[in-house]
């Protein structure tokens, strides 16, 4: 049986002994009351094309938007592009042009393009409620807080949530995102970094104020699957991870950055007790 990468020999680290979660009920209330007043986006619709999904996910029937776009005719591509901003130098008649769209590209999808892909081509976006409280430009800079801060809107609409995040044990925060999943949707098993290529375990804290999001980690063959049973946790994103479907909306917030110098040792000590 293949094994999880894990952290300190465990599938994930429950941080609830080290971080006070007594305010989660109030945080959840704030988030649910304010989310209808902001404009979340979609994300995750090109994970297969990005090459980060588990092998069994790659063969499932859920449509990936970049794979769909790569199969467009000239007319289909022109129509799709018309729903957003055309890429720089876009020429639908140039045989040597291969434009990429969406996450981790220079051509983010517009809201209209996302909906068009979903309605017309059945593209599946796992996270239809994605809201950045603190923005990052690319995946590679998600641990650097250089020049970054929480958005004015996030501070205004989610003050209690931002205050909680700011007291977490980070030296710097490079990204903070609310990932929400609609009723009956799932997040496919994927990993954020590849074992053997990353020098260290990426430092992040995720928290689920409601405790009802069935987030899991699993081994490379999908044989060993562990549902995270903790309100706040650190997991190894070299492990495949995803979210099982449920008949209701679920969400969590992930904070990426660099831990305070002694936090990892405090975690080690807590695991030995």
Residue ranges and their predicted role:
Residues 210-213, 240-241, 260:
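Short Gly/Pro-enriched loop/turn and capping motifs at secondary-structure junctions
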Residues 241-247:
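Asparagine-centered strand-capping/turn motif at beta-strand->loop junctions
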């Amino acid at each position: 049986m293949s094994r999880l990468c894990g952290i300190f020999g465990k599938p994930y680290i429950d941080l609830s002994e080290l971080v006070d979660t007594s305010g989660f009920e109030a945080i959840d209330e704030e988030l649910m009351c304010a989310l209808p007043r902001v404009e979340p986006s979609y994300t995750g619709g090109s994970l297969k094309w990005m090459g980060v999904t588990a092998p069994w996910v790659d063969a499932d029937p859920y449509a990936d938007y970049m794979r769909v776009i790569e199969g467009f005719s000239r007319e289909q591509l022109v129509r799709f592009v018309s729903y957003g901003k055309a890429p720089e130098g876009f020429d639908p008649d140039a045989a040597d042009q291969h434009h990429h769209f969406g996450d981790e590209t220079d051509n983010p999808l517009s809201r209209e393009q996302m909906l068009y892909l979903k309605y017309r081509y059945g593209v599946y976006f796992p996270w239809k409620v994605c809201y950045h409280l603190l923005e990052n430009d690319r995946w590679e800079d998600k641990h650097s807080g250089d020049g970054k801060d929480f958005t004015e809107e996030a501070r205004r609409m989610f003050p209690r949530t931002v205050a909680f995040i700011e007291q977490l044990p980070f030296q710097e925060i490079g990204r903070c995102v609310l990932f929400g999943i609609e009723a009956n949707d799932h997040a496919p098993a994927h990993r954020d970094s590849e074992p053997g290529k990353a020098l260290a375990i990426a430092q992040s804290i995720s928290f689920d104020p409601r405790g009802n999001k069935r987030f899991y980690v699993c081994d490379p063959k999908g044989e060993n699957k562990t549902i995270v049973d903790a309100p706040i946790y650190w997991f190894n994103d070299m492990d495949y991870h995803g979210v099982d479907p449920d008949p209701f909306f679920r969400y969590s917030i992930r904070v990426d950055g660099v831990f305070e110098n002694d936090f990892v040792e405090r975690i080690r000590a807590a695991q030995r007790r």
